[in-house]
């Protein structure tokens, strides 16, 4: 089965986890940014997982170097453009790129300039390639609550202009949603859609709380609902889509293999799962690679993929016009 030629949708892709290694090197040389190595093969070890990762926290260490080269308007625009260029080459027709603006203020940019630069890169790529993109703003859970309010407030002016949603990301502690009730209440009032990283690192109850306390419309990962019957039931009853990222989950040691990943069980039980990369560079993956692995190890069929694709269309925060366009590609999903 040729998964490369199939139309695809990406709903969970971090900008700072999906840079070209060549671009990191190029910007570092141009801007005099120190790197542990200027040899591409050696640098890859610092920004990609090489089967040496034992946890989500270790996985997140791979973002340190990419963020060093994402501190100017020019670089942010370039990196966003290149991401859409890369996924368009993988036949992705729609992508929701996510990033945390406050990770890019080291050289004096303000939040508005940061968001604007990424949107410019997305829009430039849309003009050249057969792809549409939107932006999800991330609030870092390892920063204080006022910083989350700041992102919500300052990003609101871009809603309807490319920004579609708010997210909570970074390391996952038990019962984190309770701290963010007021932040997400404000986000909803501003008009953001809501997706929350939860149930990625062993705490299924976080998914329950993200939906009940934070009004999450989608869940990033959500795989540990398998260990929380109440969360599983709620996700199924409310048709809450899960942004599943299998290879990333293996890298963070949430699961030992594709065969033991609960994705196929969720799909067969009617859970609205979607397949995503999480971080193309960190996990050295693409949507095509994800599908090939699921086909090889879990028996993913073309019929299964059609369900996944339509799940992603409906789960997306795209406009009704874009959703209609995405549905038109269903006829191309054949074995």
Curated annotation (Swiss-Prot):
Cofactor(s) needed by this chain: Zn(2+)
Enzyme class: hydrolase
A GO BP annotation: purine ribonucleoside monophosphate biosynthetic process
Record: residues binding substrate: 14, 16
Residue pairs linked by disulfide bridges in the UniProt entry: none
GO MF annotation list: 2'-deoxyadenosine deaminase activity; adenosine deaminase activity; zinc ion binding
Catalytic reaction(s) noted: adenosine + H2O + H(+) = inosine + NH4(+); 2'-deoxyadenosine + H2O + H(+) = 2'-deoxyinosine + NH4(+)
Assigned keywords, A-Z: Hydrolase, Metal-binding, Nucleotide metabolism, Zinc
Chain sites annotated for binding Zn(2+): 12, 14, 197, 278
A GO CC term attached to the entry: cytosol
EC number: 3.5.4.4
Site (Important for catalytic activity): 221
Domain of life: Bacteria
InterPro entries per UniProt: A_deaminase, A_deaminase_dom, Ado/ade_deaminase, Metal_Hydrolase
Cofactor note: Binds 1 zinc ion per subunit.
PANTHER family documented for this protein: ADENOSINE DEAMINASE (PTHR11409:SF43)
Stated role: Catalyzes the hydrolytic deamination of adenosine and 2-deoxyadenosine.
UniProt name for this protein: Adenosine deaminase
Species annotation: Clostridium botulinum (strain Langeland / NCTC 10281 / Type F)
Origin organism lineage: Bacteria, Bacillati, Bacillota, Clostridia, Eubacteriales
Gene: add
């Amino acid at each position: 089965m040729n998964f490369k030629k199939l139309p695809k949708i990406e709903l969970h892709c971090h900008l700072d986890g999906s840079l070209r290694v060549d671009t990191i090197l190029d910007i570092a040389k141009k801007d005099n940014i120190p790197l542990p190595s200027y040899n591409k093969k050696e640098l890859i070890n610092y920004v990609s997982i090489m089967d040496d990762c034992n946890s989500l926290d270790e996985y997140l260490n791979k973002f340190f170097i990419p963020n060093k080269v994402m501190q100017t308007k020019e670089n942010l625009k370039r990196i966003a453009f290149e991401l859409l260029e890369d996924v368009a080459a993988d036949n992705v027709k729609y992508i929701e790129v996510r990033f945390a603006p406050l990770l890019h203020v080291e050289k004096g940019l303000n939040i508005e300039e940061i968001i604007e630069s990424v949107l410019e890169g997305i829009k430039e790529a849309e003009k050249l390639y057969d792809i549409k993109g939107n932006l999800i703003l991330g609030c870092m859970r390892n920063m204080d609550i006022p910083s989350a309010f700041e992102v919500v407030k300052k990003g609101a002016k871009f809603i309807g202009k490319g920004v579609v949603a708010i997210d909570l990301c970074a390391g996952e502690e038990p019962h984190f949603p309770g701290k963010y009730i007021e932040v997400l209440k404000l986000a909803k009032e501003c008009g953001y859609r809501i997706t929350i990283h939860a149930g990625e690192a062993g705490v299924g109850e976080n998914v329950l709380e993200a939906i009940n306390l934070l009004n999450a419309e989608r869940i990033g990962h959500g795989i540990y609902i398998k260990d929380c019957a109440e969360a599983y039931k709620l996700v199924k009853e409310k048709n809450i889509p899960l942004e599943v990222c299998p290879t990333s989950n293996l890298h963070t040691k949430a699961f030992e293999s594709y065969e033991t990943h609960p994705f196929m069980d969720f799909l067969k039980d009617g859970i609205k799962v979607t397949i995503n990369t999480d971080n193309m560079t960190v996990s050295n993956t693409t949507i095509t690679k994800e599908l090939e692995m699921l086909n090889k190890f879990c028996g993913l069929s073309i019929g299964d993929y059609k369900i996944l694709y339509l799940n992603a269309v409906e789960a997306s925060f795209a406009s009704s016009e874009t959703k209609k366009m995405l549905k038109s590609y269903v006829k191309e999903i054949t074995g």
